[in-house]
Amino acid sequence: MEEYGPGIVGEVRFARQDGGYYVQLYDREGTPVGRTGLWRTEAKAREAARKLAAKIGGV
């Protein structure tokens, strides 16, 4: 788990069937709060997660 925003952590996953990476975001209690779309590279998925966490966190 990696922190993507204040109080928001996430886990990078590979969707084998779809052939791409996505990040599932969770709050501190472990409740799912969001998910990025599919990206070809892990780096792009992480960047999308940072942007999504900023929107969710209200920054």
Where is each model-derived feature located?
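Short N-terminal "domain-start" leader segments
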Residues: 1-22, 51, 55, 59
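Hydrophobic alpha-helical segments, principally membrane-spanning helices and signal/leader peptides
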Residues: 4, 25-26, 42
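A short, structured beta-strand/loop element
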Residues: 14-36
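A short, exposed loop/beta-hairpin motif centered on an aromatic-Gly-Thr core
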Residues: 30-44, 52
